[in-house]
Every structure is written in structure tokens, then in C-alpha cells.
């Protein structure tokens, strides 16, 4: 996990979210108000969800569907960067 935090810090992201392993979750993972719920141990998934925490720290909650889609695309790009590293 320290590798994940170092990677995110290099992108000026210092998440404070709590990660909750939830084996019976329908989705792989999701972020909600400071908590990442996940059934995955894939660190790329964790990177993606923690990025959402940093987005919320910087900008607050998404104000509409367009902003939510923009943030999702950005988190996906960060996840791809992690996978390529």
C-alpha cells in the first residue's frame, strides 16, 4: 500500500479515505464520502478509488452528471498510469 500512496503523492494526491474490504459487494469497488468499498485486492482498482477521494478533497462533490463523468475518466487515466508503471 505504501507504493500506492507514494504513486498518488507524486501526482499531488494524498487520500485520507478508509478502505473497507467487502467480499459480497456487487461492484468491484466504489468510493462514497471518504470510504472506499471494494471486493478487489487489485491495487489499480484501489488507486482509481483513492483518486476519487483526492478529487473530492480538491473540488467537493460532483455537481452534475457531466462532472461525475469527467472525474470518472480522470480516475481511469490515473489507474492506467498505475498499471503502466
Regions found by a protein language model. Name each.
Residues 44-57:
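Active-site recognition of the HExxH zinc-binding catalytic motif
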Residues 55-66:
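Substrate-binding clefts and substrate-entry loops adjacent to catalytic sites
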Amino acid at each position: 500500500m505504501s507504493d500506492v500512496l507514494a504513486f498518488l503523492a507524486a501526482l499531488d494526491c494524498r487520500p485520507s479515505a478508509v478502505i473497507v474490504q467487502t467480499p459480497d459487494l456487487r461492484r468491484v469497488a466504489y468510493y462514497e464520502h471518504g470510504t472506499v468499498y471494494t471486493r478487489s485486492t487489485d491495487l489499480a482498482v484501489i488507486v482509481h478509488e483513492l483518486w476519487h477521494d483526492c478529487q473530492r478533497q480538491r473540488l467537493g462533490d460532483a455537481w452534475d452528471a457531466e462532472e461525475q463523468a469527467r472525474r470518472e475518466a480522470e480516475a481511469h487515466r490515473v489507474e492506467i498510469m498505475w498499471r503502466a508503471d
